[in-house]
Amino acid sequence: FRSGMKIETIHAFCERLLRLFPVEAGISPGFTIMSEQMARAELERALRFVARRHRSGAVARALAAVARATDEETCLDLLARIHGARTALALFLGGDGASKLPPILHPLLRLPEGLTATRVRQGLAFDVDAYSGLAETLRRGPKTDRERAGHIDRQAHGGATLIELSTLFLTTEGKPRTANGLISKSLARDEPWALELLLADQERLIRGLAALADLDHVGATVELMSLAAAVVKEVADRKQRANLLDFEDLIIHVNRLLSARPEAAWVLYKL
């Protein structure tokens, strides 16, 4: 006690208030508060039900995309975080849901509005004639240069992009090659234009791959939120049938009880 008042957590206060005024809050008396373990288990059951129910369509595509991007445990962790923040997310996204995310995320990632993976790949096209000339030049160099020329010969065709030539510019770990890793010193000295071309296109490739990765993240986020919408709805239906409330529900119902519902004035008077 402090100054005669009992100090309670916000959730304990909300639970006590809802047990005093369940009908006024629009909930059934005798509700059960879910522990974190119960909430996690309910979320997992809801996810499995959604997966069984949606064998095709948008939700199925979202589930497949999320499954490709992460494992089941991480997926459940992400869904739990989204479910816990569902009220704030609903206020933020409004009725648009996941479709509202790309215009929000693109500026945060410094992606131009409306940018697509197709446009990025188109921007990574290269001049086939220029690279044919580069291959001829590389064939005059040592063994490593001749191997680079062979790689260009195999990939330099109509429709190819710098992505197909990525091993010229990047190591197996995906790191940029140094100038000496792009072309031999002797050939770079004799043919400086060749090194300039390789360095310029290396930078162009790095920027393009970064943009594609960011677009993948945006797409994965949209798919995750689409899946989460179906899972959150299923969890809500299950909780309603079993008369269960989680911690977020306590705050939601008390907020409505004290502000939005017609009985608010009477409840405040009784308090």
Which functions belong to the PLM regions below?
Residues 1-64, 100-104, 113:
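Conserved P-loop NTPase-based nucleic-acid remodeling module centered on helicase motor cores
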Residues 6-15, 31-44, 200-271:
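Conserved helicase NTPase motor core
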Residues 12, 45-75, 87, 126-133, ...:
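Accessory nucleic-acid engagement/destabilization modules that flank
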Residues 17-33, 43-46, 62-63, 75-78, ...:
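Generic alpha-helix signal with a bias toward terminal, lower-confidence helices
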Residues 75-245:
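Conserved ATP-driven helicase/translocase motor core recognized via long
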